[in-house]
Curated annotation (Swiss-Prot):
Entry GO terms, CC: plasma membrane
Phosphoserine PTM positions: 196, 226
Catalysed reactions listed for this entry: L-seryl-[protein] + ATP = O-phospho-L-seryl-[protein] + ADP + H(+); L-threonyl-[protein] + ATP = O-phospho-L-threonyl-[protein] + ADP + H(+)
Gene: PBL25
Record organism: Arabidopsis thaliana (Mouse-ear cress)
Lipid attachment points (S-palmitoyl cysteine): 3
Modified residues (Phosphothreonine): 54, 232
Keywords, alphabetical: ATP-binding, Cell membrane, Kinase, Lipoprotein, Membrane, Nucleotide-binding, Palmitate, Phosphoprotein, Plant defense, Receptor, Serine/threonine-protein kinase, Transferase
Protein name: Probable serine/threonine-protein kinase PBL25
Region (Disordered): 16-41, 347-381
Length: 381
């Protein structure tokens, strides 16, 4: 039985309903993700489907990795905007820090995963470079950057995401996760779902990126895979943190955190807030149990411009995904059904009662001074 049987079966699917199968070379026997990962355990082969670049080609594309081309930076290294010459194409080039968080294994995993798995809601890997000790990945360029840029790190004067766009982004991310869980063979556990890893195309279609921590999921009668605990604090499922046991429900929990960020406009961990509000999930849990307080979770920057029913149901979805007991969490297919219904209802609903609108307005005014500082900062992919 669906976890969201209370939702209508009507599904809004602006992003296409078909789920492509894992990638395989034309005129060749079908290869599962597991078979190819095992075959390429010591390094990617030349027939992976991704283009192999020389370091010189990528240096030329990024103007020798000039600062003016830098669009993102983190523990893994730096991301540059580049332009390939043949064929002419704008790309994003991730140059891994040789002493950074993403090592040889993570580089290999990302090349293999993105060479095999193709979906509208996964970022497209164009190629890679493994010259000497240089490790670089070349992706399609995403001009809008990450969800984090538009939700948590707004530039001064930048317009916040409206409610319908937030639901659209959540739906796209959910479809990407569902593809990994249900269509890949064997299933893939993403393990690093967070707002900075969700990239946006010009139409705000969400694409999952950074697959270095992805792991092949359990097969047959196996219920979980054991793994060293990795990921980003605040997004990791509590049972995974405690035991190292990884399941697809670990990704569902992380999705619930991202959905809560989309609803609230708050960071999952924010040490600049009062102590009882610094952990987003901990702060939200008592509100989940009191529907009369749901409006308190809405992002003040929305200024009350959202359908009350859509907000309430989005919060209900987030609460299910964040359930302490993994088996109670929904499947991503159920999440997609629920969010698709929300997308449909958001386009046809009004914003609720005058009393609720006044509460929203007051909440917005109370938050203006707060949000004018912490959420307006500089950040990239």
């Amino acid at each position: 039985m669906s976890c969201f049987s209370c939702f209508s079966s009507k599904v809004l699917d602006n992003e296409g309903s078909s789920m492509p199968a894992p990638y395989k070379q034309p005129n060749s026997p079908k290869r599962t993700t597991g078979e190819v990962v095992a075959k390429n355990a010591n390094g990617p082969s030349n027939n992976m489907g991704a283009r192999i670049f020389t370091f010189r080609e990528l240096a030329t594309a990024t103007k020798n990795f000039r600062q003016e081309c830098l669009i993102g930076e983190g523990g893994f290294g730096r991301v540059y905007k580049g332009k390939l010459e043949n064929p002419a194409q704008v790309v994003a080039v991730k140059q891994l820090d040789r002493n950074g968080l993403q090592g040889q294994r993570e580089f290999l995993v990302e090349v293999l995963m993105l060479s095999l798995l193709h979906h509208r809601n996964l970022v497209n890997l164009i190629g890679y470079c493994a010259d000497g000790d240089q490790r670089l990945l070349v992706y399609e360029y995403m001009p809008l950057g990450s969800l984090e840029d538009h939700l948590l790190d707004l530039e001064p004067g930048q317009k916040p995401l409206d409610w319908n766009t937030r639901i659209k982004i959540a739906l796209g991310a959910a479809k990407g996760i569902e593809y990994l869980h249900d269509e890949a063979d064997p299933p893939v556990i993403y393990r690093d779902l967070k707002s900075s890893n969700i990239l946006l195309d010009p139409e705000y279609v969400a694409k999952l990126s950074d697959f270095g921590l992805a792991k092949l999921g359990p097969v047959g009668d196996t219920l979980h895979v054991s793994s060293r605990v990795m990921g980003t604090y605040g997004y990791c499922a509590p049972e995974y943190q405690r035991t190292g046991y990884l399941t697809n429900k670990s990704d569902v929990y992380s999705f619930g955190v991202v959905l809560l960020e989309l609803i609230s406009g708050r960071r999952v961990i924010d040490t600049m807030r009062p102590s009882h509000e610094q952990n987003l999930v901990t702060w939200a849990l008592p509100i989940f149990r009191d529907p009369t307080r749901y409006w308190q979770l809405a992002d003040p920057l929305l200024r009350g411009d959202y359908p009350e029913k859509s907000l309430n149901q989005a919060i209900a979805v987030a609460a299910m995904c964040l359930h302490e007991e993994p088996t109670v969490r929904p499947l991503m297919s159920d999440v997609i059904t629920a969010l698709s219904f929300l997308g449909a209802s958001s386009n046809s609903s009004n914003t609720g009662s005058n009393h609720l609108q006044q509460n929203r307005s007051n909440k917005y005014q109370d938050a203006v001074q707060w949000d004018s500082s912490p959420r307006y900062a500089n950040s990239q992919m």
